[in-house]
From Swiss-Prot:
InterPro entries referenced in this protein's UniProt entry, alphabetically: Aldolase_TIM, Elp3/MiaA/NifB-like_rSAM, LIAS_N, Lipoyl_synth, rSAM
Organism per entry: Meyerozyma guilliermondii (strain ATCC 6260 / CBS 566 / DSM 6381 / JCM 1539 / NBRC 10279 / NRRL Y-324)
Protein name: Lipoyl synthase, mitochondrial
Other observations noted: This protein may be expected to contain an N-terminal transit peptide but none has been predicted.
Cofactor: [4Fe-4S] cluster
Family the UniProt entry places it in: Belongs to the radical SAM superfamily. Lipoyl synthase family.
UniProt-listed PANTHER family: LIPOYL SYNTHASE, LIPOYL SYNTHASE, MITOCHONDRIAL
Upper taxonomic lineage: Eukaryota, Fungi, Dikarya, Ascomycota, Saccharomycotina
Catalytic activities: [[Fe-S] cluster scaffold protein carrying a second [4Fe-4S](2+) cluster] + N(6)-octanoyl-L-lysyl-[protein] + 2 oxidized [2Fe-2S]-[ferredoxin] + 2 S-adenosyl-L-methionine + 4 H(+) = [[Fe-S] cluster scaffold protein] + N(6)-[(R)-dihydrolipoyl]-L-lysyl-[protein] + 4 Fe(3+) + 2 hydrogen sulfide + 2 5'-deoxyadenosine + 2 L-methionine + 2 reduced [2Fe-2S]-[ferredoxin]
Localization per record: Mitochondrion
Top-level taxon of origin: Eukaryota
Length: 385
């Protein structure tokens, strides 16, 4: 018989078999393991006590630090960052086209504030940024609102063909292709992107194609694969200054690695326009920005854009500073003096902001010039934006 806890059980004495010993088993349960502290517990401990409620001091106290950040005047948007709600016939037509053609755009996924402006004009002048290889990234940068996963769904092998067919029927003059980081793929998705570019050029050679790619985990050969695909603009964003990179970007993305990708693209095809983008407002200094511009010119990067970092959700990095339009104008002028061919700089500028409008005329002029001559591009200022 197996003794049961809490029952009175009889045992035979080993020294005297005729003697019976009655013993009650312990009824106390073994101690349960302590529960781990939770974030909710921490928030309660940081918040008002019972004495605060009794004294009436709790009315002005906030338990959630995120709520405190929301109420912080420094986190409120200044007037120059407020944009009207997207509307108009052209905007809704393009949005409908995106749904019917089953295209995923970073304009919508990343909550771009310029979607109404970029999609609001004529279709031939519109710029759309198409997201390839899914909407889930293998990295988790602290500024980005795109979904993350260690193992996203595999890329659709028919995506290059389907995307090219949809874009060729869409009627755009300029298209930007971008992608989430796919560290789960051996080549980082480089061949998938290159095949998409080739398919687009086969079906609609008049369309100018910009690719905003990742760093392929530093695999420079993959940067060469993409550079040779037939694209017109090779873009890779450096995002921020070197000192802040570990705090802003995923640990697998480094400042020097991004520079090497842009450099390899230019070395692979010197006539290729290379482009990068920086966000301001993370707490960077003027000297740090200047050093970044020097580094970019050293690798012969052609185009740079500056925009304001805007916190997508309360789970992301807080904005340290809202940079004024005048300061964006200063960086535009500074970059042009340093030799950049084109600079877009303004609070609402994003890496693909009106890319077609800025580049179509320039690419035509470059192709009409003699080999070795590089025409200077006009710049987009904060005032124009």
């Amino acid at each position: 018989m197996v003794p049961v806890r809490g029952q009175i059980t009889a045992f035979r004495c080993s020294q005297n078999p005729t003697k019976t010993i009655w013993r009650t088993l312990a009824t106390a349960e073994p101690p349960k393991p302590k529960r781990k502290r939770t974030m909710f517990t921490d928030k309660l401990n940081q918040g008002p006590s019972f004495a605060d409620f009794v004294s009436g001091k709790a009315s002005n106290m906030t338990i959630d630090p995120l709520e405190a950040a929301r109420q912080d005047p420094d986190q409120r948007l200044p007037s120059w960052l407020k944009v009207p709600i997207p509307k108009g016939k052209s905007f809704h037509t393009l949005k409908k086209d995106v749904r019917e053609l089953k295209l995923a755009t970073v304009c919508e996924e990343a909550k771009c504030p310029n979607i109404g402006e970029c999609w609001g004009g004529k279709k031939s002048e519109a710029t759309a940024t198409i997201m390839l290889m899914g909407d889930t990234c293998t990295r988790g940068c602290r500024f980005c609102s795109v979904k993350t996963s260690r193992k996203p769904a595999p890329p659709d092998p028919m995506e290059p063909e389907n995307t090219a067919e949809a874009i060729s029927r869409w009627g755009l003059g300029y298209v930007v292709l971008t992608t989430v980081d796919r560290d789960d793929l051996v080549d980082g998705g480089a061949h998938h992107l290159a095949e998409t570019v080739r398919k687009i050029k086969e079906k609609a050679p008049q369309i100018l194609v910009e690719v905003l790619g990742g760093d392929f985990r530093g695999d420079l050969d993959m940067a060469s694969v993409l550079a040779r695909s037939g694209l017109d603009v090779y873009a890779h964003n450096i995002e921020t200054v070197e000192d802040l990179t570990p705090h802003v970007r995923d640990r697998r993305a480094t400042y020097r690695q991004s520079l090497s990708i842009l450099q390899r693209a230019k070395e692979t095809k010197p006539s290729l326009v290379t482009k990068t983008s920086m966000m301001l407002g993370f707490g960077e200094t003027d000297e740090q920005i200047m050093q970044t511009l020097r580094d970019l010119r050293e690798i012969k990067c052609d185009v740079v854009t500056f925009g304001q970092y805007m916190r997508p959700t309360k789970r992301h990095m807080k904005v340290v500073e809202y940079v004024t339009p005048e300061k964006f104008d200063y960086w535009r002028d500074t970059a042009l003096k340093m030799g950049f061919l084109y600079v877009a700089s303004g609070p609402l500028v994003r890496s693909s902001y009106k890319a077609g409008e800025a580049f179509i005329e320039n690419v035509i002029r470059k192709r009409n010039h003699n080999v070795g001559e590089t025409p200077r591009l006009e710049s987009a200022s904060a005032a124009q934006l």
